[in-house]
């Protein structure tokens, strides 16, 4: 595998999320609407690492999973703008793209969060084994711990 300029490249194995953060302007009142602001951003440990590698000028592939929903389109468009290559990402047509929702209190501390990351379970050893050629050609591979690439198993999949 090589990129269009035949430069050394990195592969990041990990998740990508749509992060939705809500911050209350006043102390939170349980079981009530709280005035505040809501912001949407892209996150996920794998995506964040890939983003920073691109900022350093490193051609980077992200091995991740996205669903067949509108959130996947947001992920793909953002990664394209950043130069993160998703051409080898796992697409799960009936899956939900990972989404993380958190509510922060008026002091900026997280009060509660919900993580819909079930799609990360699709990042299996078989999926990574199917990417062997890409992984073998990489100058560097970064694997986030929940991606089933445990240290004692790595040689079997990479």
Where do the language-model regions lie?
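Conserved phosphate-binding/catalytic loop of the ribokinase/pfkB sugar-kinase fold
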Residues: 91-92, 102-140, 145
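Cationic, low-complexity basic patches in intrinsically disordered or flexible, solvent-exposed regions
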Residues: 157
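Structural motif
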Residues: 63-65, 89, 144
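Glycine-rich phosphate/adenosyl-contacting loop at the front of the ribokinase-like
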Residues: 1-65, 70-74, 80-84
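A glycine-rich helix N-cap at a beta->alpha junction
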Residues: 83-93
């Amino acid at each position: 595998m090589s990129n269009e300029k035949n430069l050394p490249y990195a592969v990041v194995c990990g998740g990508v999320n749509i992060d939705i953060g809500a911050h209350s302007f006043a102390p939170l009142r349980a079981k009530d609407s709280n005035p505040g602001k809501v912001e949407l951003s892209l996150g996920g440990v794998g995506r964040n690492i890939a983003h920073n590698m691109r900022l350093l000028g490193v051609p980077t592939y992200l091995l991740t999973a996205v669903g067949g929903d509108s959130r996947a389109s947001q992920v793909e468009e953002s990664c394209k703008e950043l130069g993160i290559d998703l051409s080898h990402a796992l697409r799960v047509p009936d899956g939900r793209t990972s989404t993380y929702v958190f509510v922060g209190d008026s002091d900026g501390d997280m009060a509660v969060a919900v993580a819909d990351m079930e799609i990360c379970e699709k990042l299996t050893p078989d999926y990574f084994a199917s990417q062997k050629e890409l992984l073998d050609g990489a100058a560097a591979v970064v694997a986030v711990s929940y991606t089933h690439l445990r240290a004692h198993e790595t040689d079997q999949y990479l």
